[in-house]
Amino acid sequence: MTTVHNLGFPRIGAKRELKFACEAYWRGEIDQTQLDKTAHTLRANHWQTQLDAGVEWLPVGDFSYYDHVLDTSFLVGNIPVRAQADGQSKLDTYFKVARGTAKEAAGASCCGGSHAAEMTKWFDTNYHYLVPELNANTHFKLNASKLLTELEQARALTSKVKPVILGPLSYLWLAKITDGSTHKLGFLDDLITVYRELLGTLAKEAVEWVQFDEPILALDLPEQWQHAFERVYHQLQLPNLSVLLATYFGPLDTNLRLAARLPTAALHLDITRGGDDLPRVLDILSPHKILSVGVIDGRNIWKADLNKLLAQLKPVKERLGNGLWLAPSCSLLHTPVDLDSEEALDADIKNWLAFAKQKLQELNILQRALDNGETSVAEALVHNAGAIAARKASAKVNNAKVQSLVNNISPSLSERESPFATRIEKQQAKYNLPTLPTTTIGSFPQTSEIRKNRKAFKSGEISQQQYDRTLRAEIAHAIELQEKIGIDVLVHGEAERNDMVEYFGEQLDGYVFTQFGWVQSYGSRCVKPPIIFGDVSRPRKITVDWAEYAQSLTSKPVKGMLTGPITMLQWSFVRDDQPRKITAQQIALALRSEVNDLEAAGITIIQVDEPALREGLPLRKKDWQNYLDWAVEAFKISTAGVGDTTQIHTHMCYAEFNDIIQAIADLDADVITIETSRSNMELLSAFEQFNYPNDIGPGVYDIHSPNIPATEQVVGLIKKAAENLPLQRLWINPDCGLKTRKWEDVIPALENMVNAAKQLRAEVA
């Protein structure tokens, strides 16, 4: 029989139950017992959903209150000293690492009680993980209590449980050395000891299978790391415990032979992104090794072409027999929970989709077809084929006018009138900004009042006119506060926006939205990615009226705020029936019209955010340049239609810039603002070494932490930035938008930021 298993399930709940419970706990509204009860219920529901869909081996340990990489750090006892305190619960220590804490005692440092761990992108996804920290004092020690508790709970439902654990080599690869310690692999022997102890503990619990996730096998691995895999997995063998080595997010390519020959009982491959690996692995796989085929895309929401997949899988089944397992390509963490919850979605489009629950049902259909013949699931296969054909032919998908515009894109469409050196002189003359000009990234707190009014408008309780009146009041409040604080370049605060991608997608043709299509971005932060189902175009102006209104309230410049084409692409569920480049070009042309309309309305500082630029990089460096070429082109198509005195800003966060600095320079934005405070300005080294030519605003405080930065802390960070970059090219700003913060935190933080800029201006005057 063909076995169906799952690598992981969404943890947040179909209605974001975990998010709301965690946030209530952080506010002190519920205690740990109540939080644990919510988590217990969610796990039970998720496991039952998987069992009902025919999953044979349940994943255990994929649930997390915040982040599975942070869970691994606690599993192996790698807890930063700064987060530890006497009398503090393990859960509070956990959240302290994740979120940091505000200053609690007079003796605390200037930057508050405890800063949060650094956060960065999980491979090429929109999920963020908390970076493990390694230093000379790091010593690993097993703490498997969380995993064992969840194991006991799962066994109340089935005996077939499979712990899911981040593998030791991927854990070290993703970590960061915080002092001058040895190479990351220098920590490996100590870590292997803990992993071996963990396997021994699981064996005593009569666990039969354990899944080690090693996604770094989809990367370009140095030779010493390849050798480390051989050494580690020879040591991670126990006679009564089978190891499934799981890889995902891309083809293994040069690492395929290595992975296939490791002494594990099973190997999982993502063939949705590495289809060429499948025929190759069949020729080198040990005859006794199980092959888990990740055949259903765990990162997108489109219904799979089951008939096409069956044609691909049948010869594999004939060759492997019971040695064939089926699974999603990766954890379903990256997909919404259940399409059945969607009641307002266009019926045609809904029929083209599959969320986590439906993806497991697709696996069940494939399993039954392979084991019992296609006639056993004939009705399901006919329905699937009809949905695939209907999508391909739909007039909702295809727009001849948009396709013509894309076909006629010329190089001149992506070039500014003059080089930066000419533009910046004209811009300085026009705006007359001080040294170290201050600004924010765009959004201000989305208060409960804002959310209440938006909900009332969407439900029809208040009219468009009433809703607009509340938004104008919020904008006026934001402008007044910024002027009072003394910020130089203002923003309108984005009160009208629920999400930086969803807001634009709602007003572009070719996009559709769900009610409950939530996925986790980080911690309790959930996003509801729009779905790009067809050709994209802009039927009307999107932001111009709000920007015009904000500008009418002040003599200071107000930035227009747009989300860039690559971020619109990366943070959406993207159609899979044409190259991503084409979809990016369609979005870029739509945004170009918006940028030009903003300029015509007198908004001449325009920010086009691209926080997801690096996220789109293919995992293999040989594929980078092709992506960067069309990604940069898309940004420039969006922004290059303006005059020299119009200043284009862009914003990026959570990224290492060294290896894409040329592409960032090629964007030719007049000002770039970046996330740097969590890395203590380390990210600026890329701009210094490259001699980045344009203006730059390194983030001077971490908005993801509740800490309020002291003026002295901000001064220190600005001075550190000035060691790397000329003072006259520096802007002062937070790391990111302030949407998720509270006004009582934002106001003093911005006041301290502005005071720091004023202090340094006085010093250099």
From Swiss-Prot:
Any GO MF annotation of the entry: zinc ion binding
Domain of life: Bacteria
Listed Pfam families: Meth_synt_1, Meth_synt_2
Cross-referenced InterPro entries: Cbl-indep_Met_Synth_N (IPR013215), Cobalamin-indep_Met_synthase (IPR006276), Met_Synth_C/arc (IPR002629), UROD/MetE-like_sf (IPR038071)
Binding-site residues, Zn(2+): H651, C653, E675, C736
Catalysed reaction equations from the record: 5-methyltetrahydropteroyltri-L-glutamate + L-homocysteine = tetrahydropteroyltri-L-glutamate + L-methionine
Gene3D superfamilies on file: 3.20.20.210
Binding residues for L-methionine: I441, G442, S443, E494, D609
Enzyme Commission designation: 2.1.1.14
Keyword Methyltransferase: yes
UniProt protein name: 5-methyltetrahydropteroyltriglutamate--homocysteine methyltransferase
Origin species: Saccharophagus degradans (strain 2-40 / ATCC 43961 / DSM 17024)
